[in-house]
């Protein structure tokens, strides 16, 4: 949460740091994108597009004219909720080998929510804990993969295609866990 008297940027920025002189230090900084808030995760898709997760949305950025600035911004998934704690929203982006995007969604403090894909698919809940979802790279075919987490993040696939996630708990509980995620789990 930004303090009331914060004098920095009003929104989050994604920046590119280049070492154009090859001396080991960045000497050129370019703002690739700015405008989101509570930006939680980024991941490059196999085609080079940058997928970004914020507390309440996932969108896809592309630089179509090679100027190191995002000039295309496509919505993928939207979260509708009154929950606003930034660290238990959408996060944990990972791509499988079959053209699907997987992502986590924290327990949202038990507040009701609706997750909406680009094809209108709407999945609703509240109070069941955190979830892992998948959709295609355009935000269609949204589905719940597994449920019952606190705050699943750090999703990754191994070479055999098995999905893993880190699930963190509230600070007063035992440490984070590395979990093997199975469909319907």
How would you label these PLM feature ranges?
Residues 1-185:
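Beta-propeller domains with acidic blade repeats across secreted/periplasmic ectodomains
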């Amino acid at each position: 949460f930004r303090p009331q008297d914060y004098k920095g940027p009003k929104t989050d920025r994604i920046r590119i740091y280049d070492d154009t002189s090859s001396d080991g230090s960045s000497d050129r900084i370019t703002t690739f994108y700015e405008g989101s808030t509570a930006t939680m995760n980024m991941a490059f898709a196999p085609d080079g597009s940058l997928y970004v997760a914020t507390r309440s949305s996932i969108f896809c950025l592309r630089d179509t004219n090679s100027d190191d600035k995002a000039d295309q911004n496509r919505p993928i998934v939207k979260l509708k909720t009154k929950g606003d704690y930034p660290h238990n929203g959408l996060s944990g982006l990972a791509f499988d080998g079959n053209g699907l995007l997987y992502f986590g969604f924290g327990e949202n403090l038990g507040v009701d929510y609706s997750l909406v894909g680009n094809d209108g698919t709407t999945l609703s809940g509240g109070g069941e804990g955190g979830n892992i979802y998948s959709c295609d790279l355009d935000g269609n075919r949204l589905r719940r993969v597994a449920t019952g987490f606190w705050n699943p993040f750090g999703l990754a696939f191994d070479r055999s295609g098995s999905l893993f996630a880190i699930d963190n708990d509230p600070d007063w509980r035992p440490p984070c866990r590395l979990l093997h995620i199975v469909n319907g789990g």
